[in-house]
Amino acid sequence: MSLPTNQLRLAMVAGEPSGDLLAASLLGGLQERLPASTRYYGIGGQRMLAHGFDSHWQMDKLTVRGYVEALGQIPEILRIRGELKRQLLAERPDAFIGVDAPDFNFSVEQAARDAGIPSIHFVCPSIWAWRGGRIKKIAKSVDHMLCLFPFEPAILDKAGVASTYVGHPLADEIPLEPDTHGARIALGLPADGPVIAVLPGSRRSEIGLIGPTFFAAMALMQQREPGVRFVMPAATPALRELLQPLVDAHPQLALTITDGRSQVAMTAADAILVKSGTVTLEAALLKKPMVISYKVPWLTGQIMRRQGYLPYVGLPNILAGRFVVPELLQHFATPEALADATLTQLRDDANRRTLTEVFTEMHLSLRQNTAAKAAEAVVRVLDQRRGRA
């Protein structure tokens, strides 16, 4: 590395928990390669703070879901973005790194780029799945894209956007062979007997929309598979409190709610019922049969449907290029349908063996030592800025 010894300053923004995870991974890699005096600041979550990150605003101020739901938060988000832009232009950091949250970060990245500050974006938006027109915005805003998936650089190259495939940090973190027995011991679950992990989301709006349906599906599954046990991770005390009325309404369920530890809960399971999102990739890396579902408000769903290109929304299916696990979305996500599909995933041993092969191949493809690759790409951008590449 040819960077000078004077203090480097890197501004970063992560807008939600999954971005906090990715940014923390990147910070770890950067701290191994950049001088100890390097300052990292902007907007981040708890994982970033653990790396000494200086967050000037609370990350949850940016965490929204869906077009309609975001309307009430727009004024505050715009205020924060305006203040951040002014701070960047005044302090002129050595680079700005936006981690996911493209609707927020692209505007900041364009302002940085226009001012001669290198702009790096970590996580290519799913332009290959929906809202493909965003690639024009990417070309205007981003100097370098860090891609989680192997097919993304070719798409960006056609638009003239420099990029690096870095793999996914979850593939580095998760072992190729999950320890189901050890996870059950850790959670106090029986070593034998079927266990289903249920993950209805982490936001109030998600729990409100799909939580009752998931709990009704669990009740049906317990009727049809009397020995089954359920495990449900609650990421925060607030989420556990949000789930409690649903738990109280179904006292017959053999349900264990864990404080966080979602990966341990999924590892302990034989099958998973899960809301669409990054957690579905985690489930695939754990080699678990699953059913993917979501419900969003009607108007949000209509907008998403009209701007989509692929017939699937779950990351395991997108990466496989075909339906390898079932998806039940919107009005198709009834308790009966979810119960039937999840029990099929639980009981079908031939399908389980096939999924293990598919997910192992996927795991190996994504296991790239992401923290190192992403950090090295950032260092190259910094070197290029200083004319020493």
From Swiss-Prot:
It catalyses: a lipid X + a UDP-2-N,3-O-bis[(3R)-3-hydroxyacyl]-alpha-D-glucosamine = a lipid A disaccharide + UDP + H(+). NCBIfam families: lpxB. It comes from Burkholderia ambifaria (strain MC40-6). The lineage of its organism: Bacteria, Pseudomonadati, Pseudomonadota, Betaproteobacteria, Burkholderiales. PANTHER family: LIPID-A-DISACCHARIDE SYNTHASE, LIPID-A-DISACCHARIDE SYNTHASE, MITOCHONDRIAL-RELATED. Condensation of UDP-2,3-diacylglucosamine and 2,3-diacylglucosamine-1-phosphate to form lipid A disaccharide, a precursor of lipid A, a phosphorylated glycolipid that anchors the lipopolysaccharide to the outer membrane of the cell. The gene is lpxB. Pathway: Bacterial outer membrane biogenesis; LPS lipid A biosynthesis. Belongs to the LpxB family. This is Lipid-A-disaccharide synthase. One of its GO terms (biological process) is lipid A biosynthetic process. Coiled coil: none annotated. One of its GO terms (molecular function) is phospholipid binding. One of its GO terms (cellular component) is membrane. Signal peptide: none annotated. It is an enzyme of class 2 (transferase). Keywords: Glycosyltransferase, Lipid A biosynthesis, Lipid biosynthesis, Lipid metabolism, Transferase. Its EC number is 2.4.1.182. The keyword Lipid biosynthesis applies. The keyword Glycosyltransferase applies. Disulfide bonds: none annotated. InterPro entries: Glyco_trans_19 (IPR003835).
